[in-house]
Every structure is written in structure tokens, then in C-alpha cells.
């Protein structure tokens, strides 16, 4: 299991650099998570594991070389293609078609539409043998912009990177007769909720059978000061507020209650406290419904 885990991590790192966001705000929001991570670090002895993973290893070098070959020859062009053909969450049919066709061509059996999600899929290595199962998560949805969908969060690269890692590790297992297998999980709509796709897939039992699941995400940083888990993301909370009013014609507005005015005050009040927030804090919002006619409150 450790060997397959090491190969999986090495393959992902060969295709992209990973870094952690570490700020006082994140640490305060994730105290309990950090405590658990600290206990896990002590159990695993991350420094020793890092030294082992970065030591000379012929098998790992073969895997990383294969990752580079796949990326340079085939998967970077796929990433560029997905970038130029963005699809928002739960409509990523073209991206999924590209990713799954490539997996099928490299000895993976694909099941599409898992957990009732049209653009979710599971791809299992058909040459795998009983043993540890390395899971690789890929995402491929685009952001929603005022001028249409666009890729601004590296999801166009994440799929190809994950495929390179999964295929390189799978080929290594077969070539060296190492027990184990690889499963790729295609998870849609990461930028668009609800539904929370990974939660839906988890509740449906899609991830059962995986011994460990890894995922990569592109970043501009190429190194960290020390080995360790760190905190990987800001604490994210999604909140939906609904304001209720009473309709009235604008000429007799005093007979109604203008819910839209309350919504605008909410946004203004949030803006008024931004100057006191730490620079890494982000609060964003959108008005999904603000009335049907301008002459009705």
C-alpha cells in the first residue's frame, strides 16, 4: 500500500506543483482539523516519509518519466482543448467525453452517470489485481462569467494531470507485477452548488473500495519551506439568505415592504467591514432574484 501511495503522490507531483495556503485566519477556522492533521503527522513521521519519497527510487523515476511523456505528448494538448471549450458544472459533456475516451484507450473501464449525475464517472483499471486501490479524483467544470463560461481555476488542467498520474501508476503495477489497482473518479460541478457532487457520490457509495484518494490542483508556488500537510484551503461556508417583503405599486410604496432594499443593505454592510478583514478573507455574493418589475416594490 505504501508503495502505491508513494507512486501516486510522485505521479501527481510530477505533473504539477502543490502548495498549501497557511494564514492565521485559516488556522483559527480549522483548529480541530489541524489538531487531527498534527496527530496524523506524528503517526506517519512525515519528515522521514518525505525523505524516503525523495530518495533515489528507480520505480518512482520510471513513473514520473512516464507522466512527463504523457503530459508532453498528449495531455497538455487535451488541457488546452478543455480550456478553449469551457462547460459549467453538470454540463461538462465534452470534457467528460475527452477524459473517458482517453482512459478507455489506456485499459480503464468507464461507468458514466454514476450517483445520478450525468457528468460524473468512475474509471477502473481493467488490468488491476487484488490489493490496495489508489483513487484519483479529477474535476473539469468551468467558472461562470458575465460573458460566458471560462476556465480560471485550473480545472481544465486537473483532469489531464490526474489521468497522467493514474495511467502511469497503473502501468507500473502491471509491468512490475505489483498487487493493486487504480480508480479514477470524475466529479462534476465543483464550482457550482447545489448539489454537492462529491457528497452525493459519497452517499451513493461511489468511493467505496478506495484505500486512499488523491487529487491535484495547480498553483503558482513551486515549493514549501518544510514537509508536512499544512492547510490546503480556506474555510468555505455557503450561505443563502431569503428576504420576504410585501408587494405594492410604486405610487403607494408605503403599503408594502421592499425586500430588495434589505438585500442591498446586506451587501452594503458587508462592504463596510471589508477594511477590517484580513487580506486572505473573501466574501462574495450574488442576487439570484430581485423582483419582476421596476414599478412594484
Walk through the language-model features, giving the residues of each.
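A short, glycine/Asx- and small/polar-enriched loop/turn
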Residues: 127-132, 235, 296-297
